[in-house]
Amino acid sequence: AETLSPASSPTSLPVGEWHHCLPSQSGLLPEIDNALEYPQPALKSARDSDAPDVFGSVAVPVAHTPLDTKWQSASQAKLVSSSGPWAQMLKSASGQSRTVKVRAVNNWVNGHVRFTDDRANRQGADRWSGAAETLRSRRGDCEDYAIAKMKLLEAIGVERGDMYLVIVDDLVRRADHALLIVRIGDQMWVLDNETDKILNA
C-alpha cells in the first residue's frame, strides 16, 4: 500500500453528531504490523474528551463542511444486516471482540469491493454511495469503502460515536483519500481500502 500523508487541513467527519476539522500537522501515517495484537502506548487517552486524537492532532468541532450533503445521504441509507452478501461475515463476527470485528469487516470489504473511481465513470462527478449499494454492486471508491465499513461495524455493535470518516491528502497520487477511523480501547485505528493491515492513527 502507498504511504499516506495527512493534508495540511484534513477533514474528519464523525459518524456521531459533530463534524470535525483536524488542525495542521506533519509526518507520515505509520504502518504497524500486527498493530492490534501489540498496540503502542497512547500518548493521551482518546476518551479524555469528546474530540478524537487522530494523526497526533485533536479534532475541533465545526458546524458545517462542504461535504455535509453527501455525508447525510450516504450515512442515512439503510443496511439490513441479515440480508445481503455480507450476512454470513457479520454473523461470524457478531459477539467477538471489537478487534476481531474491525479486522473481519476491513478484510471482507477490501476483498469484496473493486475500486472504481467515480470521477472516471461519471464525467467528473464524485458521488458518495450508501453501504448496501456499494456492497451489492461490488464497486466503489475510497469513501464508499469507508462508509460501507462503518455501516457494517455499526450493524454488529460498534457505536457510531467511536467511528470517524476522515479525508486526507494522498501526496503520492495527489488526490483526496477517505479513511475510516475506529476507536478500540484508548487507541484510534485506521481502516484503509489500500491495505488489509490495520494502521495506527
Where are the regions that the model predicts?
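A structural boundary/capping signal
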Residues: 1-201
